[in-house]
Amino acid sequence: MKGAFVTGSTGFVGLNLVEELLRQGWQVTALHRVESDLAELGRFPVTLMPGDITDAASLRAAMPEDVDAVFHVAGNTNLWSRRNARQTRENVEGTRNVVETALARAARKLALTSSIAAYGEQSGELTEATKSNAGKSWINYQRTKWLAEEEVRKGIRAGLPATILNPGAIIGRYDTSGWARLFHLVAQDRLPGALPGEVSAVHVGEVAKAHIAAAEAGALCGTAAHHRPRSGDPRGDHRQAAATHPGIGRALDA
């Protein structure tokens, strides 16, 4: 049985990944903060390990030796500048700790949950060949996601097989804020307005499966980008998404 170590296991993407790993027969060790709500994660047959990615000692104590795959899902998506210091600590220093611990524990593969935000501000279609400008971005989230990728690339150069995944806007089960909140407002006809624009959306089930596929791809190192552009009237797009969001209507196909 393959073994997985998952950070961010109590979050939206982490819970879906844990569920998919178990469905595919993996043995899961789930890192969680001491203060985290374990109501959802506690339902799954996983090994719960308290710790924090910003605490290297707790990571070393939690991560199994020679684990088949480390899934670094934990991340700070804050867009409030007053919390930039914490975001930098968690996204950059936390990723550095995960990479260094994975190397020390001889992990066979690492998969990083990054974001298309790590490409910065771009025009046109994004591909894996697109050059990021996020390192100079005034948006701390963009910059720290790119810097987190840099930590993984350092790990690759040090001999750690790793893959970076760049999903767009993730929607699906276990989301209790973000897009889910927007969809509920639309479903209740309480959305006051919507600006024109587009969003690249991907279902969380596909994101979870992509992580596992990346971990099973042997020594392959690279970036997998998910982007599904939507266009047209923004309120219409939001209504379509709301009608198919789990908990509101028919679940989106995974």
What positions do the PLM features span?
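NAD(P)H-binding glycine-rich loop region in Rossmannoid oxidoreductase-like domains
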Residues: 40-93, 101
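Active-site Tyr-X1-5-Lys
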Residues: 138-163
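NAD(P)-dependent short-chain dehydrogenase/reductase
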Residues: 158-164, 168-200
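Conserved Rossmann-fold NAD(P)-dependent oxidoreductase catalytic core, especially the SDR/UDP-sugar
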Residues: 93-141
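Conserved catalytic-site region of short-chain dehydrogenase/reductase
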Residues: 79, 116-125, 170-176
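Substrate-positioning beta->alpha
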Residues: 97, 147, 178, 195-215, ...
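Mid/C-terminal beta-alpha module of Rossmann-like enzyme folds, strongest
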Residues: 210-254
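N-terminal Rossmann NAD(P)H-binding glycine-rich loop of SDR-like oxidoreductase domains
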Residues: 4-24
